[in-house]
Design a protein with these regions (language model features):
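Boundary/linker segments flanking structured domains
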Residues: 1-40, 46-52, 57-155
Length: 155
């Protein structure tokens, strides 16, 4: 498995409704391939350089965000908890390439290692995190999670 990215966006929400998507320079934009394609992605939502949420999706990123914008609670899903905090948000996305049959498990392992590394760094789980998929990890998973967090904290 290799990761392509990060692709960095700034998001503005009002009442769980996406108002704007901006690139790193602050210019209005749209999500672009590979974020608009089906395929695994690791994504991290931050606010003021604080990690709020770490997630994995196989959907286009806009579809995944839209799902989190519209919680109904009836099926037990209450949407993204981080959307209850004021923005703007930074969205970091890595596109997953390769990985074969175990791609989901590999990216979920990395997701869990990043969440754990955030907890180790700040003493608390990310405030918007509501679930984690745990799998046995390797030294490479732990190294990569630290590298990803260094990228986020240095932006």
């Amino acid at each position: 498995m290799t990761l392509e990215g990060p692709f960095i966006y700034r998001l503005e929400y009002r009442d769980r409704c996406l108002q704007s998507v901006k690139d790193e320079q602050g210019c209005a934009t749209k999500f672009a391939p590979p974020m608009t394609k089906v395929g695994f992605k690791l994504y991290i939502v931050c606010r003021l350089s604080v990690v709020l949420y770490v997630g994995v999706t196989n959907r286009p990123i806009r579809d995944r965000l839209r799902f989190g914008e519209n919680p109904n609670g009836a099926s037990g899903y209450h949407g993204y908890k981080w959307m209850d905090q004021p923005g703007p948000y930074e969205l970091f996305i890595w596109n997953v390439k390769g990985g074969g049959d175990n791609q989901r498990m590999e990216i979920e392992t990395l997701e869990a290692e990043i969440v754990y590394a955030v907890r180790a760094k700040i003493g608390q789980w990310p405030s918007g995190q509501t679930e984690i998929h745990f799998h046995e990890s390797s030294n490479e998973d732990r190294r990569l999670s630290e590298e990803i967090l260094a990228t986020i904290y240095n932006c």
